[in-house]
């Protein structure tokens, strides 16, 4: 293990401890653990604090981690440096988030006014944190989306990768905000194979008010579905925000597991959904968060000993079990005569290989993946 890798592991452990406290069944902070985490951060150099902040930002947990840290530092004498550092970083991040939500709201309303059904997916799951881009799902056609974004907001359409075209995704850059707005049009999944599941996102969406603005967002079950597609069937890694977001849903009993199973089976991804939940429960357990997952869910997990591992800045999913889950999804599409999925899912392995080759050659897979 290199010094850099060891340092990242140390920072990730600190972040996990700060963020995951209070997300277990007891939903309470451990004073001894918080004080230990505070001491660990207090001992960091200026460069160490910068690296710690970068890791928190990459995992979309900056606000949650620093809020806990700031409260602890303010309550214990001798940590003025950490208090000041937290205040500065939080003020900057909250300003970014506020601007992003203010810019997203009129886009959302304009799409609705154009006759589109629309929901904000993934982005608001991390609240009070926010991701590095903003995701929308809509049933509208791409011409409507492009017309609204370009004509009403002077947005610049970003170049589309092969993966974007398969998934029917479009990215737009607004002059007023640094984050991209990514619009998923009519389908979900890396190859755009999920049509029925995508329809459920709108049919079962719920209202949510954020920053004084109202949005439709996926119901908890569809949140799990969307993140499973992203983490288990596409990226093969989790951000720490995923662990915190879904640990909180499990803690609060917000997930209807019968409804979740019904939805996942429609898309042929029930084993992947069950694996997704197991990985979350197993990871947060190491930080004192005891979460219960029904036995009927765990029975659908093909590899009960699967665990995430730290690789780079994220928590990686082992490729072997993930390949098995992909094969299971493809077989399910065949059994159910899902022609769209049957024709599109086989395109995923060559797409992934092309992305890997592009990354190895150029250090960037954006034109492919």
Annotated model-derived regions:
Residues 2-132, 138-369:
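Conserved NTP-donor binding/palm subdomain of two-metal-ion nucleotidyltransferases/polymerases, i.e.
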């Amino acid at each position: 293990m290199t010094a850099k890798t060891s340092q990242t592991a140390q920072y990730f452990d600190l972040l996990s401890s700060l963020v995951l406290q209070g997300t277990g069944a007891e939903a309470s902070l451990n004073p001894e653990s918080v004080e230990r985490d505070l001491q660990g951060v207090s001992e960091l150099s200026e460069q160490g604090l910068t690296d710690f902040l970068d890791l928190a930002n990459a995992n979309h947990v900056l606000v949650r981690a620093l809020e806990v840290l700031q409260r602890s530092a303010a309550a214990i004498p001798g940590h003025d440096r950490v208090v000041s550092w937290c205040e500065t970083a939080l003020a900057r991040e909250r300003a970014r988030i506020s601007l992003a939500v203010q810019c997203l709201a009129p886009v959302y309303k304009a799409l609705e006014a154009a006759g589109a059904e629309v929901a904000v997916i993934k982005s608001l799951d991390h609240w009070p944190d926010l991701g590095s881009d903003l995701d929308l799902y809509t049933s509208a056609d791409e011409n409507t989306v492009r017309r609204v974004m370009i004509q009403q907001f002077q947005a610049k359409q970003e170049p589309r990768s092969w993966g974007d075209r398969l998934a029917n995704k479009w990215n737009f850059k607004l002059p007023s905000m640094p984050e991209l707005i990514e619009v998923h049009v009519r389908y979900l999944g890396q190859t755009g194979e999920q049509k029925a599941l995508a329809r459920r996102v709108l049919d079962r969406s719920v209202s949510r008010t954020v920053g004084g603005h109202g949005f439709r967002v996926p119901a908890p079950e569809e949140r799990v579905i969307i993140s499973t597609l992203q983490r288990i069937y596409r990226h093969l890694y989790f951000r720490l925000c995923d662990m915190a977001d879904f640990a909180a849903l499990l803690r609060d009993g917000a997930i209807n597991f019968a409804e979740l199973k019904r939805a996942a089976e429609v898309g042929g991804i029930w084993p992947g959904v069950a694996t997704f939940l197991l990985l979350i429960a197993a990871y947060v357990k190491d930080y004192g968060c005891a979460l219960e997952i029904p036995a009927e869910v765990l029975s659908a997990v093909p590899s009960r000993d699967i665990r995430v591992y730290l690789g780079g800045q994220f928590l990686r999913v082992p490729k072997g079990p993930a390949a098995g889950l992909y094969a299971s999804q493809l077989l399910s599409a065949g059994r159910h005569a899902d022609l769209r999925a049957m024709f599109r899912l086989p395109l995923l392995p060559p797409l992934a290989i092309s992305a890997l080759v592009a990354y190895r050659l150029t250090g960037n897979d954006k034109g492919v993946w």
